[in-house]
Swiss-Prot record:
UniProt GO BP: translation
Similarity annotation: Belongs to the universal ribosomal protein uL4 family.
GO cellular component labels: ribonucleoprotein complex; ribosome
Protein name: Large ribosomal subunit protein uL4
Species for this entry: Campylobacter hominis (strain ATCC BAA-381 / DSM 21671 / CCUG 45161 / LMG 19568 / NCTC 13146 / CH001A)
Function: One of the primary rRNA binding proteins, this protein initially binds near the 5'-end of the 23S rRNA. It is important during the early stages of 50S assembly. It makes multiple contacts with different domains of the 23S rRNA in the assembled 50S subunit and ribosome.
Gene transcribed to yield this protein: rplD
Amino acid sequence: MSKVKVLNEKLEKASELELPANFADVNPHNLYLYVKSYLASLRANTANTKGRSEVSGGGKKPWRQKGRGGARAGSTRTNVWVGGAVAFGPTNNRNYFQKVNKKQKRLALEFALNEKAQNDKIFAVDSLEISSGKTKDAAKFIKNLGVRDALIVKNELDSATLLAYRNLNNCYVIDINELNAYLVAVYSAVIIETSALQSIVKEG
């Protein structure tokens, strides 16, 4: 059973919070499916080329079929002609959506959290609020914790804390409702408010 370190105000270990045993029994394939779906949803789908039916011109046969010694041609807009259509090019009418049901999303999150806990890369703190809203205070907190980059998870995200972390390129701050398996997996450490972690454990 994996345990999460609960830190005090001095960022010293005060206690531990156990994750449910079922978090360790999740098939890792659920995480793969969720990450694949999440990344697919980020695709802009803007690349577009014109096919034979879309390119302008080329309706008239450029020369007669036989008798002039050259290769036959039916249109000046085939893909082998300069200015012609593109064969098998990207189109912007593709749908990259990949469905992942709620249970799989939940299982993926549980697996990701359990992996972080096993590697001692998830920390619980009573409060992550930075009332000053200053980036230097947020940077100092991360430096004292000794992590390269971190996902900051608050129970309720306030504007001052968001302002403090916004300019740090090695941190990303969210509230509990935005937490997902991809974000947990992509950051090297997760720092979460104790109340938020308890709500996750309760649901699990």
